[in-house]
Regions:
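Composition- and surface-driven signal marking solvent-exposed, interaction-prone regions
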Residues: 373-379, 480-482, 497-498
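N-terminal pre-Walker A segment at the start of P-loop NTPase domains
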Residues: 433-453
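Conserved small/polar residues in nucleotide/adenosyl-binding loops
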Residues: 495-505
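Short, solvent-exposed loop/turn segments at the edges of secondary structure
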Residues: 155-157, 355-357, 439, 449, ...
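Extended, folded cores of ATP/NTP-driven motor/assembly subunits in large transport
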Residues: 1-431
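Short, glycine-/Ser/Thr-/acidic-enriched flexible segments
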Residues: 367-369, 449-451, 460-461, 473-474
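P-loop NTPase nucleotide-binding module
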Residues: 459-494
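Structured core elements
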Residues: 71-73, 163, 361-363, 443-445, ...
Length: 506
């Protein structure tokens, strides 16, 4: 017992061995392991390139650590064909809509013209043969419909979205505030007479899949698949590859694309510019990133700018006195900038205007460079028509592409300050389209603004009844007979016609 105690005492008094110094090779190996764990900050997969963290089933997207967004899809209304008073009312309501968003909410308006679906459109006007003696007439009528279809761009699937993003400490805090904003946005659309609906997580992922796969392809996904498979939502929407090494172009799967920004140079903007770009018969994606500036901060900034201009004006006047010429002769730029700054201050203080920072992005995709360049030149021509410039984002194609998807993230730091009325001039409404594919859909002519075919199955409308109104000799009877012939050739419905002036009797 005593021996064991002495042994333990001796062991306790022994000094610990000093730590061994690492060799140079070991230090290098440890540093390499740490570097690999940290990464180089670059995306090495297509999934890592897509800049959001998580998409939730209710439609909320966690974009960054504190940023959350939600998307609302909305339909078009007849703006360009409306009367002047109606257009003014729509424009003023749209200004109020934009003024609703404060500096804590970033807004993204997305206009997506998906790739051509001409085959589906032609299928909608195909008239099958029937067991009667009128198939030759059906063939002639079908050829006429195809010729009319070629005059428009019914093959393009057009969609409009508004995405709003906020910063919050947690998902719960973001969810409650996004719900309030969503309700207000839907009410504002209702005042405009616009049909709108919030998008679920599945719908947002399907939309992103369509952007990343412009050549088409089926989207197969369910949130219940994530846990068993260990995959993320990005695995179901990412293309086969991204390539951004060319500077002025990018490659996405089998497609080549290019993104540009709109440089606003015109002193006065026109509400037709956005509509003309969206009327191009090619796949194009236009995004407007809008961020409101705090009103008091905007006024302070403009006042400081006016003070600086006045100071420069005084210095120029002193220089004029010393040089012996009239002190009223100052550089024209000083006088111009001073007047514009004072006018802007007056608008913010007395005309219900706010200041916004706006970024306008235009993205095109095509099968080859030649087609892509032609699409870019077409959009560039429209911009020049309205005294603006469309410029390619050299060596920023990755950031521009990811800023062109509706998740509420803007990675392009090229912004233009605009007032509410100047921002609202990018009116997101043109004309309401009506193209219902179905076995009994009838042809009713072409849209007067877009030249797109009007194809309607009146049985599917809320009110299928119809009246033909017009002055004498304007073609009321011919219109009725044309619809009767169309219904006879397309459907198997029974037609009963009563004419009081014995023009026809069936």
């Amino acid at each position: 017992m005593q021996k064991e105690t002495r042994r333990n005492s001796a062991a306790g008094s022994a000094k610990p061995n000093p730590p061994r110094k690492l060799t140079r090779a070991e230090k290098k190996q440890i540093a390499e392991i740490i570097r690999q764990a940290k990464g180089d900050g670059k995306a090495h997969t297509a999934q890592q390139t897509i800049p959001y963290i998580q998409m939730y089933p209710d439609g909320i997207c966690k974009v960054t650590g504190r940023k959350y967004s939600k998307t609302v899809a909305f339909e078009d209304i007849n703006y360009q064909l409306a009367q002047a008073d109606d257009k003014t009312a729509i424009f003023e309501n749209w200004c109020d809509f934009l003024n609703y968003f404060d500096a804590s909410v970033s807004v993204q308006l997305s206009f997506i013209n998906q790739g051509t679906q001409r085959g589906e459109a032609e299928k909608a006007v195909n008239i099958p043969a029937q067991e009667d003696a009128f198939n030759s007439i059906r063939t002639e009528y079908r050829d006429m419909l195809k010729n009319q279809l070629a005059k428009g761009n019914n093959g393009l699937v057009k969609a409009k979205y508004i995405t709003f993003a906020i910063e919050a400490d947690s998902l719960g805090a973001a969810k409650s505030r996004l719900a309030r904003i969503e309700t207000d946005v839907l009410n504002n659309f209702k005042l405009l007479g616009v049909s709108a609906r919030p998008m679920t997580g599945y719908e947002r992922l399907k939309m992103l899949h369509g952007i990343f796969h412009p050549e088409g392809g089926q989207f197969a996904f369910d949130f219940s698949w994530l846990a068993p498979s260990g995959l993320s939502t990005k695995d179901f929407i990412a293309p086969s590859s991204f390539r951004f090494g060319e500077g002025r172009y990018f490659r996405m799967g089998k497609k080549i694309g290019a993104a540009s920004f709109l440089e606003i140079l015109a002193p006065e903007l026109n509400d037709r510019m956005l509509a003309d770009i969206l009327d191009l018969e090619t796949g194009v994606i236009v995004n407007l990133h809008i961020r409101s500036i705090d009103q008091s901060e905007a006024i302070k900034t403009i006042k400081r700018k006016i003070t600086d201009l006045d100071k420069m004006k005084i210095e120029e006047q002193k220089k004029a006195v010393r040089s012996g010429y009239d002190m009223d002769i100052i550089p024209s730029d000083l006088a111009t900038f001073g007047g514009e700054a004072k006018n802007l201050l007056e608008q913010l203080q007395s005309r219900n205007e706010r200041m916004f920072l706006v970024t306008v992005l235009v993205m095109n995709t095509a099968d080859n460079k030649q087609k892509l360049d032609n699409m870019f030149f077409a959009a560039q021509g429209i911009a020049q028509k309205y005294n603006c410039a469309l410029k390619r984002l050299d060596f920023q194609q990755e950031q521009a592409l990811m800023s062109s998807v509706p998740i509420g993230l803007n990675q392009i730091e090229i912004q233009r300050g605009l007032t509410t009325s100047s921002t609202a001039i990018f009116v997101p409404f043109t004309t309401q389209e009506l193209f219902q594919a179905g076995d009994e859909a009838l042809y009713y002519g072409l849209n007067a603004l877009s030249n797109n075919m009007i194809l309607v199955d009146r049985k599917k409308l809320k009110n299928p009844n119809g009246l033909i109104l017009g002055t004498p000799g304007s073609g009321k009877s011919f219109s009725a007979k044309r619809e009767i012939a169309n219904a006879f050739l397309v459907t198997v419905s029974y037609t009963h016609l009563r004419a009081h002036e014995t023009e026809a009797d069936l």
